């Protein structure tokens, strides 16, 4: 990324030649990420950081379903997700924080019990950034799909380390 901070800092959306070259680089990066997680390139959106990506997912779930004001997440999410969830509570949302087992795993039965008719989103990291524990994303996503609830996973710690196939996981975002 360093060349894009120091010498290739143009606007990839611009109509001039320098911007066109950057567009090609950006498209190539989008293709690489899509290949890594078995997604379509058009499904890849770049943001400034993981926090922005996660907050955007929460916001999109709530704004597109204004009648749903409940979110389910875990007590061991990244600090930025916990902080945003607490902020959403101050704005009138209800947030259920699922506990983890002594070994750091999630009890999927508790997830099923936590989902309500007004649940807008379930958010769960794929791999814990502190313990390395892998959460059962395929199973959690299937539970959410069966209940008609959007499912978000922060997979940044898992990408490139475990196989991620967003087409098989039923992940919403």
Residue ranges and their predicted role:
Residues 1-173:
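Pyridoxal 5′-phosphate
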